């Protein structure tokens, strides 16, 4: 895709998203993206629902019979992801800021009983330190300043795929929320692609090892080459999936 084709693709995609979202049409690219995004982004975080189960939940609000018991949290977070995606569309006219990011977290997590029972901050930054595996993240008291610095840096850039890769890697190091950082981070990526005429993408769970290694590479040496390469691969996959819905 060249720049002209990408811009036309994003414009067409947005047009279909809003038409289908407002008319509650789940049969097109909006519904497909909702299902694919919720499945992959949650699966990366060890959600156990299959794509078929998520599709049924989105289309009808009903889960099919299963030999394996459903975990309530998996269902709650999947429903939250659907709502977070809609919030992303609703806020596209506004420049990314901390309030928008917090609103994504609220939509994702406000219906999750376990998080509320654990007294996690919902729609607000974390109150307790957390880690990524064995790696320390930004302390709760330092998160507001760290997020301000990150957003100030971001808005001073000419936005490109490399810029988004660095933003995402830095966001994940801050880990501003008690839980849900990866999913809010990935919805931000999709949103900012749409806002800046960059072909959007969904990180597939099948590419989770590559994704985690790319984030690790940034922590170790500050490079985003591996992450950008992954984003490009995911762009191609999502674009190819979208072509079906745009065929005459």
Whereabouts are the PLM-identified features?
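FIC/Doc superfamily catalytic core
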Residues: 1-179, 183-248
């Amino acid at each position: 895709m060249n720049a002209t084709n990408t811009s036309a693709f994003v414009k067409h995609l947005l047009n279909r998203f809003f038409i289908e979202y407002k008319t509650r049409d789940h049969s097109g690219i909006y519904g497909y993206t909702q299902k694919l995004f919720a499945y992959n982004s949650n699966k990366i975080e060890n959600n156990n629902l299959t794509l078929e189960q998520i599709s049924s939940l989105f289309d009808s609000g009903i889960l099919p019979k299963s030999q394996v018991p459903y975990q309530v949290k998996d269902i709650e977070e999947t429903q939250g992801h659907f709502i977070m995606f809609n919030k992303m569309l609703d806020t596209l006219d506004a420049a990314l800021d901390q309030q928008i990011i917090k609103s994504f977290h609220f939509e994702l997590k406000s219906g999750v009983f376990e998080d509320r029972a654990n007294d996690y901050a919902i729609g607000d930054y974390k109150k307790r330190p957390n880690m990524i595996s064995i790696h320390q993240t930004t302390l709760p008291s330092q998160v507001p300043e760290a997020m301000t610095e990150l957003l100030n840096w971001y808005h001073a850039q000419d936005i490109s795929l490399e810029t988004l890769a660095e933003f995402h890697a830095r966001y994940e190091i801050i880990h501003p929320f008690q839980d849900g950082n990866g999913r809010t981070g990935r919805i931000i990526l999709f949103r900012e692609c749409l806002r800046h005429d960059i072909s959007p993408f969904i990180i597939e769970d099948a590419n989770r090892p590559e994704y985690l290694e790319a984030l690790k590479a940034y922590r170790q040496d500050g490079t985003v080459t591996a992450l950008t390469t992954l984003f490009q691969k995911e762009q191609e996959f999502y674009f190819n999936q979208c072509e079906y819905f745009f065929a005459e």
